[in-house]
Amino acid sequence: MFQPLSSKPSFPHRHLLGIAGLSAQDLTILLDLAEEAIEVSRQVEKKRTSLRGRTLINLFFEASTRTQSSFELAGKRLGADVMNMSVATSSVKKGETLLDTAMTLNAMRPDIIVVRHAQAGAVHLLAREVDCSVVNAGDGAHEHPTQALLDALTIRRNKGRIEGLIVAICGDILHSRVARSNILSLSALGARVRVIGPSTLLPTGIEQMGVEVFRDMREGLVGADIVMMLRLQRERMDGGFIPSLKEYFRFYGLDEEKLALARPDALVMHPGPMNRGVEIASRVADGPQSRIREQVEMGVAVRMAVLEALSQHLPNG
């Protein structure tokens, strides 16, 4: 599939647990591999053998459509045997702890486990207890590294660079693992990152991550090269974070009028799923500046790249 990693800098990590701890070079290695994976995915014959004979387990404790199916497709395109573990019908629903689940899965001798869990840090716990490689597919409000990678890839392919760009991340920053991972990755790659949202949806001390903070969306969008919208994660809210959805859209929903404040060639992105009419207007989501559908294609390529990179650390890999 790809050129042997020995001919270029190799990804030095056995797991992908987050963007935190990765260098700009680590990120670039994965993005470059993903560029090659895009070409593979666009061929008639998409099947490769990098993971032939290997077992990939998708262990999702939270519902997912895009991420789980993307990892499944990525694994199959690399030749892996892919098992999707349904938590709804598993021992977890019968009271089994995460540690017990980890020990059970480890006894099956998988090569890579992809995990999504509602608890921040759960993926790190599991990685300490298993012998295989572990990929974080989202842990609580902590991180979502492959989403950040596919967003960076989308930006780089459209703009030709990331360094020096102004990226405005707008919406529910407080509950968003996507926001955290994107802040870490884009900052490491040289972008200027802004976060925009009401005070109730901005984490305390977010400035310490090196971002510019705006509570006025119009002010925050001025001169932006990339506008990245986030959905309201109402399933993680237990109080009155916003007065109403109508008021939220009025002040923080991306419509054509607000988008006009960004650069004329600004790109619009969204990790999905979208709430049309809440954080983004349909005319913007489906408009010429939108790269939302392209992000989905980049997701498969990035996850192929991650699995390929980790395969170099598997026994006899």
Curated annotation (Swiss-Prot):
Named in its record, the pathway it takes part in is: Pyrimidine metabolism; UMP biosynthesis via de novo pathway; (S)-dihydroorotate from bicarbonate: step 2/3
User: What Enzyme Commission number(s) appear in the record?
Assistant: 2.1.3.2
Which sites bind L-aspartate?
K94, R177, R231
Signal peptide extent? none
The UniProt record gives the binding positions of carbamoyl phosphate as R66, T67, R116, H144, Q147, G272, P273
Q: Which reaction does it catalyse?
A: carbamoyl phosphate + L-aspartate = N-carbamoyl-L-aspartate + phosphate + H(+)
**Gene Ontology biological process terms, A to Z:** 'de novo' pyrimidine nucleobase biosynthetic process; 'de novo' UMP biosynthetic process; amino acid metabolic process
Q: Which UniProt keywords apply?
A: Pyrimidine biosynthesis, Transferase
Q: Name one GO molecular function term.
A: amino acid binding
Query: So which domain of life are we looking at?
Result: Bacteria
- Pfam families documented for this protein: OTCace (PF00185), OTCace_N (PF02729)
Can you supply one Gene Ontology CC term for this chain's record?
Answer: cytosol
Q: Has the keyword Lipoprotein been applied to this entry?
A: no
Q: What does this protein do?
A: Catalyzes the condensation of carbamoyl phosphate and aspartate to form carbamoyl aspartate and inorganic phosphate, the committed step in the de novo pyrimidine nucleotide biosynthesis pathway.
> Subunit arrangement?
Heterododecamer (2C3:3R2) of six catalytic PyrB chains organized as two trimers (C3), and six regulatory PyrI chains organized as three dimers (R2).
Membership in a protein family: Belongs to the aspartate/ornithine carbamoyltransferase superfamily. ATCase family.
Q: What protein name does the entry list?
A: Aspartate carbamoyltransferase catalytic subunit
Native source species: Beijerinckia indica subsp. indica (strain ATCC 9039 / DSM 1715 / NCIMB 8712)
Its gene name is pyrB
